[in-house]
């Protein structure tokens, strides 16, 4: 929501949603201000039951605890947060490099403590760039092996990493881009702790064919994110037929 439009929006309109929508922290800054606690209270006032925060892992423990207290008071549930430092500019999981793998697994272990602190169940994983020096099938094996090790860490805690394919236009060169690819990886990892985050916006740009792909991947999808194309704006503002998708 843009600041210029904020004055036009009534604030006392709690709504009973049919789906468990989770706004991202920061979406309502124009209405609720910059303070995360004020934003959580605003979300609850509007009828939302969940929220997500990609940056939760990097917030101070004090703020995490304060946010958890607010969540409990307002009956809000934590959605996804990003579990690790995403390698936007280098191959990490696809490379098979042992040091890269160990660094990733160390961050997964640390994110368990964050998840416990904020009562989160899902954490986002992006496998980083392709390694253009290796055949894609070897890279896939490297990613699968690393994710299996991550599942060994997560399973005892009942936590789920959701691997997110991202589109080639916004994030050129990434290893994981398509839903069939994510589906095959999850099938190979074969763990309740490795599922798909299906971002409808990204997949519309990357591959389209949204409803058949969702149906084909359904058993491996644990989480959806939404946004319309072009521009990653509100649903119904662009080309995606969200009425049919929902």
Locate predicted features.
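Aromatic- and acid-rich polysaccharide-binding/catalytic face
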Residues: 192-203, 221-225
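Active-site acidic/histidine proton-transfer and metal-coordination neighborhood
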Residues: 15, 93-195, 205
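N-terminal pre-domain/capping segments
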Residues: 1-120, 191, 207, 219, ...
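Generic enzyme active-site microenvironment
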Residues: 50-51, 162-163, 197-200
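Distinct, well-ordered alpha-helical segments
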Residues: 32-36, 40, 64-68, 140, ...
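Short, glycine/acidic-enriched loop or turn micro-motifs at the edges of active sites
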Residues: 55, 167, 202, 231
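Active-site clefts of carbohydrate-active enzymes
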Residues: 228-234
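Catalytic-core regions built around general acid/base machinery
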Residues: 66-75, 146-154, 213, 244-245
């Amino acid at each position: 929501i843009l600041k210029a439009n904020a004055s036009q929006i009534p604030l006392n309109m709690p709504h009973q949603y049919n789906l468990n929508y989770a706004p991202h922290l920061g979406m309502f800054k124009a209405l609720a201000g910059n303070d995360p606690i004020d934003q959580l209270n605003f979300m609850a006032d509007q009828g939302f039951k969940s929220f997500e925060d990609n940056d939760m892992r990097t917030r101070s423990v004090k703020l995490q605890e304060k946010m958890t207290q607010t969540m409990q008071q307002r009956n809000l549930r934590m959605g996804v947060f990003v579990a690790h430092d995403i390698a936007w500019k280098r191959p990490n999981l696809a490379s098979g490099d042992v040091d890269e793998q160990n660094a990733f697994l160390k961050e997964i272990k640390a994110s368990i403590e964050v998840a416990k602190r904020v009562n989160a169940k899902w954490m986002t994983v992006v496998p980083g760039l392709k390694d253009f020096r290796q055949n894609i099938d070897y890279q896939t094996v490297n990613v699968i092996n690393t994710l299996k090790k991550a599942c060994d860490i997560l399973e005892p805690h009942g936590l789920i990493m959701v691997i997110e394919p991202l589109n080639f236009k916004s994030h050129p060169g990434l290893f994981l881009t398509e839903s069939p690819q994510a589906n095959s990886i999850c099938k190979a990892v074969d763990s309740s702790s490795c599922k798909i985050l299906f971002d409808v916006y990204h997949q519309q740009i990357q591959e389209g064919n949204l409803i058949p792909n969702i149906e084909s991947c359904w058993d491996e999808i644990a989480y959806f994110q939404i946004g319309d194309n072009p521009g990653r704006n509100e649903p119904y503002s662009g080309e995606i037929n969200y009425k049919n998708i929902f």
